[in-house]
Amino acid sequence: MATLQSLADLNRANTQTSNPENEAPVHVQKLDAQGRAYATGKRKDAVARVWIKPGNGTVVVNGRAVETYFARPVLRMILRQPLEIVGRVDQYDITVTVKGGGLSGQAGAVRHGLSKALTYYEPELRSPLKREGFLTRDPRVVERKKYGRKKARRSFQFSKR
C-alpha cells in the first residue's frame, strides 16, 4: 500500500476503494447442496425454518400435510399469500419446521420465512414481496405483565371508600 502524504491523498484513496452509495446492492441466488433455498421466519414467539425447491406445490409442515396442521382456512391463506403475489402457486415444494407460539403466530412465521426463501431462490421477486411487506419482521410481541397490576396494563379494581 502506498504511503499517504496529505489529506487529499487519503480522500482519493477512500473514493477509489468504496462503492458509490447510489448503487443498488446485488442480490444473488442462495441455494444449498440439494438445490433448495432455506430461510427462517419469525412472528411473536414462533420460529419457522423453511426450505423450498421446484416441484408441484406440496407443502409439509412438521412432517404433516398443511391441511392437517393448519386446519383453519384463514391460516392456509396466510401461507399462500407470498406465492399468490408473485404468481408462483404450485411451482415449489415447501418443507417447514415450525415451533413456538400458537397457530396464528406460526402461520405468520411460515409466511415470513417463505417470503425470504423465495427471494433467495429468485432474487428478482424481492421488490414485489417487499412492497407487500412480507419481508419485514412484525415486531409486535406480547407486553409483559407488571407487578402491582392485574395484567400488562389493567390495574386492580380501585375502591375509593
From Swiss-Prot:
In terms of SUPFAM superfamilies, this protein maps to: Ribosomal protein S5 domain 2-like
Reply yes or no: does the keyword Ribosomal protein apply.
yes
Sequence ranges of Polar residues compositional bias: 1-21
Please name the GO terms that the record assigns under molecular function. Answer: RNA binding; structural constituent of ribosome
The record's InterPro entries line, in alphabetical order, gives: Ribosomal_Su5_D2-typ_SF, Ribosomal_uS9, Ribosomal_uS9_bac/plastid, Ribosomal_uS9_CS, Ribsml_uS5_D2-typ_fold_subgr
* Segments for region (Disordered): 1-25
Any Pfam family the entry gives: Ribosomal_S9
Q: What GO CC terms are in its UniProt record?
A: cytosolic small ribosomal subunit
Supply the alphabetized keyword list.
Answer: Ribonucleoprotein, Ribosomal protein
Gene Ontology biological process terms from the UniProt entry: translation
Question: Sorted alphabetically, which HAMAP family does this protein's record hold?
Answer: Ribosomal_uS9_B
Which family is this protein grouped under? Answer: Belongs to the universal ribosomal protein uS9 family.
Query: What is the protein name stated in its UniProt record?
Result: Small ribosomal subunit protein uS9
According to its UniProt entry, this protein's organism is Methylorubrum populi (strain ATCC BAA-705 / NCIMB 13946 / BJ001)
| Gene from which the chain derives | rpsI
